[in-house]
């Protein structure tokens, strides 16, 4: 059996990294479907998607400077497109305050990209330019993996994993593993190093999910539904669950239920 060379292994892990990264980019689809159904982005944050967009844009530039980094180009080109889609959906359904905040972040992001690219291209050359952009990419990638920290804090505070899907945490961990080995065999420190932290953050997120995954369900059973019990003529207990977020609608629903009970006597 022929022994695989480092180039072969880097290609294999890069290809696997593309596949898993593709799934990572698509993992928030259920979240945005929920936003679409609710017609509201309240409770969700755009920051992780903004940071991911910035990272994908910088990595495209880094791949251009390194040459022959087609596997980095392919996935980050797709990443830019999908993150822009997510951010657009978020802005469409976000409350006014969130729209303004996200808009300022977008302007800041575009301004940062507009500074990094021309400055490094004009003021640095060759390997020195690659090194500068590589360090910037490494720092941003660390921020990408650290972005869910705010969501992790929210999970601990609310004891709910609603805003931290398990599939996203799982694929982030797998993604970090694949790209670490790609960078390792490619001898690309700027790709390998951030993914060590990415792997660790992913493990912590999955542990938090298993710790708190049943907490919200228990809390809901204890406090959220308005439960009223009454007895029919036959002595059978009838439970009326009202889970409407709007209190007026809940009261109207309760009145209708009791009306049905009265007319059935």
UniProtKB/Swiss-Prot annotation:
Disruption phenotype: 'Early open anther' phenotype; anther opening in young flower buds that contain immature pollen, resulting in poor pollen quality and impaired pollen release. One of its GO terms (biological process) is pollen development. Residues 30-44, 93-103, 152-164, 212-265 are cytoplasmic. GO terms for cellular component: plasma membrane. The keyword Zinc does not apply. GO terms for molecular function: sugar transmembrane transporter activity. Residues 11-97, 132-216 form the MtN3/slv domain. The keyword Transcription regulation does not apply. The chain crosses the membrane at residues 9-29, 45-65, 72-92, 104-124, 131-151, 165-185, 191-211. PANTHER family: BIDIRECTIONAL SUGAR TRANSPORTER SWEET9, RAG1-ACTIVATING PROTEIN 1. Belongs to the SWEET sugar transporter family. Mediates both low-affinity uptake and efflux of sugar across the plasma membrane. Promotes the formation of phloem bundles in mid-veins. Probably involved in the development of stomium cells that control anther opening time. Required for pollen viability. This is Bidirectional sugar transporter NEC1.
């Amino acid at each position: 059996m022929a022994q695989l060379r480092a180039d072969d292994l880097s290609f294999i892990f890069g290809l696997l990294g593309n596949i898993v990264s593709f799934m990572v980019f698509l993992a928030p689809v259920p979240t945005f479907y929920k936003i679409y159904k609710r017609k509201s982005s309240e409770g969700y944050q755009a920051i992780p998607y903004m940071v991911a967009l910035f990272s994908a844009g910088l990595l495209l530039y880094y791949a251009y400077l390194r040459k022959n980094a087609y596997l980095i180009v392919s996935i980050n080109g797709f990443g830019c497109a999908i993150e822009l889609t997510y951010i657009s959906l978020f802005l469409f359904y976000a409350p006014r305050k969130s729209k303004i905040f996200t808009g300022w972040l977008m302007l800041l992001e575009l301004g940062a990209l507009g500074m990094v690219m021309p400055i490094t291209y004009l003021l640095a050359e060759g390997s020195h330019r690659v090194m500068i952009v590589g360090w910037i990419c490494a720092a941003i990638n660390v921020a990408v993996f650290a972005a869910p920290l705010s969501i992790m804090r929210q999970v601990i505070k609310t004891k709910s994993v609603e805003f931290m899907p398990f599939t996203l945490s799982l694929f982030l961990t797998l993604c970090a593993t694949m790209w670490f080995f790609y960078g390792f065999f490619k001898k690309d420190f700027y790709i390998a190093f951030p993914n060590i932290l990415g792997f660790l953050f992913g493990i912590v997120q999955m542990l938090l999910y298993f710790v708190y995954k049943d907490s919200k369900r228990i809390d809901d059973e204890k406090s959220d539904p308005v439960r009223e019990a009454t007895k029919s003529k036959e002595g059978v207990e009838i439970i009326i669950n009202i889970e409407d977020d709007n209190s007026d609608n809940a009261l109207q629903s309760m009145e209708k239920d009791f009306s049905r009970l009265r007319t059935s006597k």
